[in-house]
């Protein structure tokens, strides 16, 4: 299993193999997840002071805030995966 890295904006990169979900921060349950992660010291703010547009939930229960749209992060995830599969052929 090879490591897949995803750019989440402003030079920040996460391991794609450990991502559980990429969601919008608008709903009350997601806001609760963010506040719970902050209390547990498991919140990583990668927004550089900008508005949070995507919340990335990792398999280690860490929550990462990103200033990039969830669709954009997901597309980077899929495009990178497709690129690597085509490179193997």
From Swiss-Prot:
HAMAP family: RemA. It comes from the Bacteria. This is Putative regulatory protein ssl2874. Pfam families: RemA-like. InterPro entries: RemA-like (IPR007169). It comes from Synechocystis sp. (strain ATCC 27184 / PCC 6803 / Kazusa). Belongs to the RemA family.
